[in-house]
Each structure stands twice: as C-alpha cells, then as structure tokens.
Swiss-Prot record:
Inhibited by the competence and sporulation stimulating factor (CSF), encoded by phrC, which prevents RapC-ComA interaction. Homodimer. Interacts specifically with the C-terminal DNA-binding domain of ComA. Interacts with CSF. Induction: Part of the rapC-phrC operon, which is controlled by the P1 promoter. Transcription from the P1 promoter is activated by high cell density through the phosphorylated form of ComA. RapC is part of an autoregulatory loop, and it negatively regulates its own expression. The gene is rapC. Pfam families: RapH_N (PF18801), TPR_12 (PF13424). One of its GO terms (biological process) is establishment of competence for transformation. TPR repeats lie at residues 102-138, 149-182, 183-216, 223-256, 263-296. Belongs to the Rap family. Disruption phenotype: Deletion of the gene increases the expression of the ComA-dependent genes rapA and rapC itself. It comes from the Bacteria. This is Regulatory protein RapC. It is found in: Cytoplasm. Involved in the regulation of genetic competence development. Inhibits the activity of ComA, a transcriptional factor that regulates the development of genetic competence. Acts by binding to ComA, independently of its phosphorylation state, leading to the inhibition of ComA DNA-binding activity. Does not dephosphorylate phospho-ComA and does not affect the phosphorylation level of the ComP-ComA system. The keyword Cytoplasm applies.
Length: 382
C-alpha cells in the first residue's frame, strides 16, 4: 500500500460509527463524522463496495435530516437531495450480495415510504428481509422491524404492524440512547390501537410519547404527539378536543418551521370546521393549508385540499371528487379513499341525497376490499 493511503477497512469502521449516530438522531456528531469520512475517502485505497456503502449512509443520513428538522434550522447547507442520492446508488450497483444488498433494499424502502409509495416501500423491505440473516447487529434488526411496521400501518395491515413494532420496541427499550425511536414506537402502537378502536390505550401511548418528546426537546416529535392525540379524539367524533390538539401541533410545527408536517394538521382542522358549518374558519385554514401543501410540494395533500373545495364549496363538484379518488387509486392509497369516501357519503346523507350517499358507501366498501387484497402486492419482483 502506498504511503499516506488510508485502508478501506479503517474508513469502513468510521462509516459504521457514523451510522450509529444516524440511528440515534445525533445530528451534530453525524455531521462531524460525515465530514471526516468525506476527507478520508480522497486518500483511501479504491474499494467499490466501500464507496457504495458510503453512498448508502449518505442517503440514510439525508433521510434522518429530512425527518427530524428542517435544514434551515440546522444550519446545514448544500445537502444533496434524496432523488440525487437514489440515482447515484442505482447507477453504482453491481451484483450485490449479503449486507450491502440488505442496505440497498432497506434504504430504498425508506425512500419510497418517504414519498408515500407504501406498497413499493414494503416490496423493498421484503427484499431486504431476505438478507436479514446477514444483519448481526440487534439494533439494526430493530430498525428493520420499526420501518416495516410503519409501512404496514399505512396499508392498514394492523396485525403485521403490531408484531413488528413489538419486536422493535423490545430491542430499543433495553438501550439508553434510543429514546427517539422509543417515542416513535409509541406512535406506531397508538395509531394501530386506534384502528382497533382501542382509543383509551392509544391515548396512553400518545401521552407517554408526548412527555418523552418534551423531555428530549424534539419539536417534530412533540408536534407529532399533539397531532396523534388530536387524531385519537377526532376518530371518536370528539371534535372540540381534537381541534385543540391539532392547533397545538400546528403551533409547534410553525414555531419551529417544520413545514412538511403542516399540511396534514391543517387538513383535519379544515375538515372539522367544514363539518361543523363554520365556513369562515374553515376557509381560513383551507387557504393556509393549501399554501403549505404547495410550498412543500406535497401533492397528496394538495389534492386533498382540492377535494375539500369540491365537496364543501363547489356545491359539490362530483368531477373534482372523483379526480381526487383517481389520484389516490393510482397511488394505491385505499385507506385514504376509505376515509374520504366516508366523508362524502355522510355529507350526502345529511343533505338527504340518499342515492349519491349510497354510491359512496359502496366506494368505502370497495376500498376496504382493496386494503384486504393489498398484501399480495408486496411480492412483486424488483
């Protein structure tokens, strides 16, 4: 080896340490180590697998940043986009085996999840699962269980979500530095319990998560805990306490400039005010929520705000409603169709337009059937 050339094995050990900081959401430590590794790569002996491993960790690093805090608050500049990193990884893949194959599929699943492409995410996760035997680190196994549990929840596969989140939680709770993940586990427990109509137990998880998030001083998690508590009350038709918690979520996100989380909370506040007949308040939140959806390039919530326009302000506009549903069908977002079709069915029922109401109740039933059928879609070969 030439003098001054750094062994790839030494850089590999640093990348492993970098990943430990990423998994514990230790942003400053992760940033420092990333910068050190970038310098060492310039003097490292050539190793194509190690370079791909670095690219994967850079990708995972960016996923952490995108979730946890806005970049402008962290004072981190010139971060590559996830789409750029994804293209770089795809272009550098060879015949991957073992642990690298696991990471490629696992991190790609996280990327697809971030785009709300849930079936695609689970498809990649299940490819990663085939290589899970190469993962000796029990924390990394917990990461896998946690991420696939999240995706199963969004596809309304409650049984599989709860099994995996229990596996993840039992590993994280034995550690001293994984409080962020423990908080997130409580979120996943809670939302699944809501789907089982066990609201009391769900609220316990959310309140415990809120207390932990406040202790950790993580604004994103505090806001998410408030949002989940609002959702818990909303699903029980307790609209006033639901709005109180959604407002707290909005206040937390806005004060910390966590704009990516705002469209979701604004949407439900807007919907509640429309349902209560408070159209002036609804219009105020509708306008701001739609602007946030556009600002953050959140096409899903932009379409949902357009749905509210079609239902409540355009007398209603059947073509606009169906345009929203077609968009959601194209993304296999049948859980969202179920929720929104139910809103339309109830609205028409209250207006005594029973034939239209019945047609949307049938759409609710069809969406539920599609959710039940969705498990087989995860086996698509990629």
């Amino acid at each position: 080896m030439k003098s001054g050339v750094i062994p790839s094995s030494a850089v590999g050990q640093k990348i492993n340490e970098w990943y430990r900081y990423i998994r514990t959401f230790s942003v400053p430590d992760a940033e420092v180590l990333k910068a050190e590794i970038q310098q060492e790569l310039k003097h490292m002996q050539h190793d194509s697998n190690l370079l791909l491993y670095y690219s994967l960790m850079e990708f995972r690093h960016q996923l952490m940043l995108d979730y946890l805090e806005p970049l402008e608050k962290l004072n981190i500049e010139d971060q590559p986009s996830l789409s750029e990193l994804s293209r770089n990884i795809d272009s550098n893949q060879a015949d991957l085996k073992g642990l690298l194959d696991y990471y490629v599929n696992f991190f790609r699943g996280m990327y697809e999840f971030d785009k709300r492409e849930f079936i695609s995410a689970i498809t990649y996760y299940k490819q990663a699962e085939k290589k899970l035997s190469f993962v000796a680190d029990h924390i990394e196994r917990a990461e896998f269980y946690f991420k696939i549990a999240e995706a199963y929840y969004y596809m309304k596969q409650t049984y599989f979500s709860l099994i995996n989140i229990k596996n993840a939680y039992e590993i994280y709770v034995e550690q001293e530095t994984y409080n962020v993940r423990i908080i997130q586990c409580h979120f996943v427990f809670g939302v699944n319990l809501m789907d089982e109509r066990n609201f009391e137990q769900a609220a316990r998880h959310f309140k415990l998560a809120l207390n932990m998030a406040q202790a950790e001083q993580k604004a994103q998690l505090v806001g998410r805990a408030y949002y989940n508590l609002g959702l818990c009350y909303y699903n029980q038709d307790l609209l006033d306490p639901a709005i109180d918690y959604f407002e707290k979520a909005v206040s937390t996100f806005e004060s910390s400039r966590i704009v990516n989380s705002l469209p979701q909370a604004y949407f439900l506040i807007t919907l509640i005010y429309y349902k209560q007949g408070k159209h002036d308040k609804a219009s105020e939140y509708h306008k701001r929520g739609y602007e946030y959806a556009k600002e953050t390039d959140d096409a899903d919530y932009a379409v949902k705000f357009e749905f509210l326009q079609s239902l409540y302000l355009d007398q209603p506009n059947e073509e606009g409603i169906e345009r929203c549903f077609q968009y959601l069908k194209n993304k296999n977002m049948y859980a969202d169709i179920e929720d929104l079709a139910l809103e339309v069915a109830k609205y028409y029922y209250e207006q005594k337009w029973f034939k239209l109401s019945a047609s949307y109740f049938l759409q609710v039933e069809e969406a539920r059937k599609q959710i039940q059928r969705s498990e087989g879609l995860y086996e698509i070969e990629i």
